[in-house]
């Protein structure tokens, strides 16, 4: 009632069923659209734990192992190079071979070297000056050597799609 949030949906699950489900408030205040129990929400980074659980379920089912090279499922990750430098004046990029392949575990732990463009100056430079799309950029460090917040979870989602033959939303 104090308008702190526009709307919400609550659900209580008990004994395999829904004991309670209810919509409150507005899905869109500006248009006056009421919240419904089937309103679709943008959940942003909450997809990370959901995708990670999907990967762990596939591991439990024996469909993959955490130390599998990610390139076994996504060939585009094979032989990823590590960024050494980006010359913003000439748009030239210097890379070197990675010490080892990126694994599923690296993608789960954000230790793959794959960065978001907004999370590192190097990744921004690769996009802005060298014109390299994020999905094709060299990695920022050797896999497993350090933590870098990045789009590894997106690659995990693509791995789920590859193994399951379904889109992640399914």
Task: Name each model feature, range by range.
Residues 9-13, 23, 42, 65:
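Short, conserved beta-strand segments within well-ordered enzyme catalytic domains
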Residues 103-110, 152-162:
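Active-site-proximal alpha-helical segments within enzyme catalytic domains
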Residues 144-152, 164, 168:
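Short, contiguous, pocket-lining structural segments
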Residues 28-148:
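Active-site-proximal loop and beta-strand segments within enzyme catalytic domains
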Residues 57-64, 160-169:
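Bacterial peptidoglycan biogenesis and beta-lactam-recognition machinery
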Residues 18-25:
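Amphipathic coiled-coil signal-relay and dimerization helices
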Residues 17-18, 63:
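Residue-level signal for well-ordered, solvent-exposed loop/turn and beta-edge residues enriched
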Residues 1-15:
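Beta-lactamase-like hydrolase cores
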């Amino acid at each position: 009632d104090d308008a702190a949030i526009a709307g919400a949906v609550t659900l209580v699950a008990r004994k395999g069923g829904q004991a309670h489900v209810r919509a409150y408030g507005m899905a869109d205040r500006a248009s006056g659209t009421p919240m419904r129990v089937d309103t679709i929400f943008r959940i942003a980074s909450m997809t990370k734990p959901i995708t990670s659980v999907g990967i762990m379920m596939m591991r439990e089912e024996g469909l993959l192992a955490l130390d599998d090279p990610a390139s076994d499922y996504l060939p585009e990750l094979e032989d990823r190079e590590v960024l050494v430098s980006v010359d913003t004046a000439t748009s030239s990029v210097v890379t070197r071979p990675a010490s080892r392949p990126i694994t599923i575990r690296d993608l789960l732990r954000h230790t793959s070297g794959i960065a978001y463009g907004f999370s590192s100056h190097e990744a921004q430079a690769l996009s802005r000056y060298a014109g390299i799309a994020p999905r094709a950029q060299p990695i920022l460090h050797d896999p497993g050597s350090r933590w870098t917040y990045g789009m590894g979870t997106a690659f995990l989602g693509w791995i789920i799609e590859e193994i399951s033959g379904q889109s992640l939303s399914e």
